[in-house]
Amino acid sequence: MYALSEKGERIRAMFGSIAPRYDLLNRLLSLGIDRRWRRFAVKKIGLNGSGRVLDVATGTGDVALEIASQTPASVSIVGIDFTPEMIELGRVKVKDSRHCGRITLQVAPCEEIPFDDGSFDAATISFGIRNVVDRIKGLAEMHRVLKNDGKIVILEFSTPTLPVFKDLYHFYFLKVLPKIGGAFSRFSAYQYLPDSVLEFPSREVFKGMMTQVGFKDVRHFDLTGGIATVYVGTK
C-alpha cells in the first residue's frame, strides 16, 4: 500500500474537509466555466468504440460522468481518488445518474494505481495533477496502466500569458478567491488553491515531465486566455 508523504496526508485531509461543498464552490468560483473546460478535455480522448477509461483524482465524479455522456455505452469508466469523502459523494452522484452501470469509483492514490499494466485505453486527470506530491511518479503510473497508443488527457489550472490578464488573474486568485472560498469552507483550503496553481510548472516544463516518463506527441491547448490548459499525450 502506497504511503502518502506528510504533505500528501495534509492535502488529502484538506480535500476531505471541503468535500460536501466541493462542487458548489467550484461552480461559484469559476462561474461555471469549469464545466466547459471538462467537456473540451473529454472530447480530446477521442474514444469512439468500446474501451476502458481511467479518471484519476476523480473527486465527486464530474469527469467520469462527462466521459460517460460523450462515449458509447460500450465504454466503461473507472474513477479513483485518494480522498474517501470525495468517493462517497461521487458514488451517490453516479448511482443517481443514467450512467450508473458504466462507472465504478474507488479510493486509490495517483502514485500507486491498483491496476495491471496496459489496462486502459485512455486516462484523464482534471485539476488533480498539481495536488500529486510526486508528479513524476503519478505520471509514470498513468503511463504504465495505459495500453500502447493509449491517450492521456490532463486538465489543469495555469497562469495566463497576457500581462494585463495575468495581473487581474493573480489579484483574483490571491486576494478574492480565498475570501470567497473562506465564506463557505475552511479559509486555508482556498488559500491552498491559488498557491498550488502559482507554483505549478510552466507549460513547457510540464510537457517535458510527460515526455520524461514516456509519453509522445505531447501538446497543449490553452483555455479561456490561459486560465486553464489541457495537455494531451500518447503512450
Swiss-Prot record:
UniProt keyword list: Menaquinone biosynthesis, Methyltransferase, S-adenosyl-L-methionine, Transferase, Ubiquinone biosynthesis
Pathway participation: Quinol/quinone metabolism; menaquinone biosynthesis; menaquinol from 1,4-dihydroxy-2-naphthoate: step 2/2; Cofactor biosynthesis; ubiquinone biosynthesis
Chain residues that bind S-adenosyl-L-methionine: 60, 81, 126
GO biological process assignments: menaquinone biosynthetic process; methylation
Catalytic activity: a 2-demethylmenaquinol + S-adenosyl-L-methionine = a menaquinol + S-adenosyl-L-homocysteine + H(+); a 2-methoxy-6-(all-trans-polyprenyl)benzene-1,4-diol + S-adenosyl-L-methionine = a 5-methoxy-2-methyl-3-(all-trans-polyprenyl)benzene-1,4-diol + S-adenosyl-L-homocysteine + H(+)
EC number: 2.1.1.163, 2.1.1.201
Gene3D superfamilies referenced in this protein's UniProt entry, alphabetically: Vaccinia Virus protein VP39
GO molecular function: 2-methoxy-6-polyprenyl-1,4-benzoquinol methyltransferase activity; demethylmenaquinone methyltransferase activity
SUPFAM superfamilies referenced in this protein's UniProt entry, alphabetically: S-adenosyl-L-methionine-dependent methyltransferases
InterPro entries in the cross-refs: SAM-dependent_MTases_sf, UbiE/COQ5_MeTrFase, UbiE/COQ5_MeTrFase_CS
EC supergroup of this enzyme: transferase
Signal sequence interval, chain numbering: none
Matches recorded under PROSITE patterns: SAM_MT_UBIE (PS51608), UBIE_1 (PS01183)
Main function: Methyltransferase required for the conversion of demethylmenaquinol (DMKH2) to menaquinol (MKH2) and the conversion of 2-polyprenyl-6-methoxy-1,4-benzoquinol (DDMQH2) to 2-polyprenyl-3-methyl-6-methoxy-1,4-benzoquinol (DMQH2).
Family designation: Belongs to the class I-like SAM-binding methyltransferase superfamily. MenG/UbiE family.
PANTHER family in alphabetical order: 2-METHOXY-6-POLYPRENYL-1,4-BENZOQUINOL METHYLASE, MITOCHONDRIAL, METHYLTRANSFERASE
Name under which the protein is recorded: Ubiquinone/menaquinone biosynthesis C-methyltransferase UbiE
Species of provenance: Citrifermentans bemidjiense (strain ATCC BAA-1014 / DSM 16622 / JCM 12645 / Bem) (Geobacter bemidjiensis)
Gene name in the database record: ubiE
